[in-house]
Amino acid sequence: DQSCPWCGFTCCLPNYCQGLTCTVI
C-alpha cells in the first residue's frame, strides 16, 4: 500500500510487513 511509509525494503516502525503488504499501526 503506497500510503504506508517504507524504510528501504521494510516498513517503517511501528508499522509491519505482512507478505508484500505493509500494515500501518
Swiss-Prot record:
Expressed by the venom duct. Transmembrane segments: none annotated. Disulfide bonds join 4-12, 7-17, 11-22. The keyword Phosphoprotein does not apply. The keyword Nucleus does not apply. The modification 4-hydroxyproline is found at residue 5. GO terms for molecular function: toxin activity. Signal peptide: none annotated. One of its GO terms (cellular component) is extracellular region. It is found in: Secreted. Keywords: Disulfide bond, Hydroxylation, Knottin, Neurotoxin, Secreted, Toxin. Causes scratching and restlessness in mice. The order of the last three amino acids has not yet been definitively established. The cysteine framework is VI/VII (C-C-CC-C-C). Displays a mini-granulin fold, a structure composed of two short, stacked beta-hairpins connected by two parallel disulfide bonds. This newly described fold is derived from the same cysteine connectivity as knottins (ICK fold). The name 'mini-granulin fold' comes from the structural homology with the N-terminal region of the human granulin. This is Conotoxin QcVIA. It comes from Conus quercinus (Oak cone).
